Amino acid sequence: MKPESNFKLKALIVGIDGEDKGFSINNLLTLAYIEDIKSASVQMHISLTDTVDGILSELSGMEPVYIEFEDNEGNNFNQNLMVYDIQGRVLQGSKSKGTLVCCSPDLINNASTKVSRRFGTGGGKTIDKIVKEDILEGLLETSRDIDARATKNTFSFISPYWSPFTMINYLASKSIPKEGGTKNASSGYAFYENADGYNFRAYDSFCDDTFKYKCIVGYEEPAEEKPDPQIIAVDAINIVENGDILMGLNIGSFNSKVMTFDMKDMGYKEYDFNIHKYYKSVPKLNGDVTLPKYFEKFKKNTVPTRIMSKVVDTALYTEGTFTKDLTKQLSQSSLREKLFYNKKVEIEFTGNILPRVGEIVELTTYRGKDRNLDTANSGIYVIGRIHREYVSSNDRMTTKMTLFTDSAGDVQATSQTLDNSAEDIVK
């Protein structure tokens, strides 16, 4: 028996020359929707065919698109987008097909907006308010929801004809979280868009979230029971990156030194970094884990594996709080970002369309014939990328999810292994 489709197209409307043109499921060849925690805009690729009036030949870009679909559980997805490219267009008689490459309308506005002005006048302004009120709502005039987490530090700077998203990425490395972290909270924010809107939040803040979904490798739903919407059944995981040691040595992730020269007062300072001191103090997704043995080789007095020099001019941003330690903040935020993406895992499944980039999941996987918990790869992860794809030939939507974790060691258990035996939940 053919499995039930988990994709139902509710609406697909493209504005062409001021008129709305509706497309049905019969016109849809493929659809790919992408969210990325490193990107300020969602993307969608829509491949269409038209055998009636060849309307696709009239597309030239900048057409508004509204799409709405749901899965077999009634979970709804809808988005307003803008066409910025048409690829693979084929015209043959009355038939036409092509792929509409779409993004958020704000991304188009961002590319056409370049601003030179001072932000945070009068002694500085908290960075979260600059991002939300001055840039996203003020410059872009976005209608999207904005989750801008509070920052501890105020800031003032001059934008040298930057686009709005460039400004936000510039400010992200200088932002220190106000709440939700610890006294050792690190500077460094992530800025991204998901289906719910814009997000500007500290890397540390992800550690405060509880997991929303359980990704279990080899899971089979018990017979005659209603499916648990929190559980995502996964056949296998692909460990893409697992803390490249050689790269870590080259970029100074374990032991490094930064030497700075400030044009403002000709001041010279050195900042030392050691993974032992930093790793123990920074909030992490999996809390205290058993670190790999090679970490012992990078003790406090180890010679730096990378020495970096930097010339700065703090006269450009002397207003606000915490600006006197700006160079230290920049170095710290860079290291926090690298730690955040320390390990990369990919999974694929068919089903729930609700997971969003930035949400927390718990991954449980097993090893060996005895199906013991794989402590090296199980644990808490953040969803870093989502790629959903519908193909008309199989009438199914699959989801590829990229997960990241900042924990370099082994976990002791997951909620699933505490609540159930491996024999009860896996094949």
Q: Locations of the language-model features?
A:
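Surface-exposed cap/loop segments at beta↔alpha junctions
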Residues: 53-145, 156-157, 172, 176
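Solvent-exposed coil/turn segments that connect beta secondary-structure elements
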Residues: 49-51, 70-72, 82-90, 103-108, ...
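Short beta-strand and beta-hairpin "edge-sheet" elements
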Residues: 25-26, 70-102, 365, 369-401
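Short beta-strand-centered interaction patches in the first periplasmic/extracellular domains
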Residues: 97, 147-247
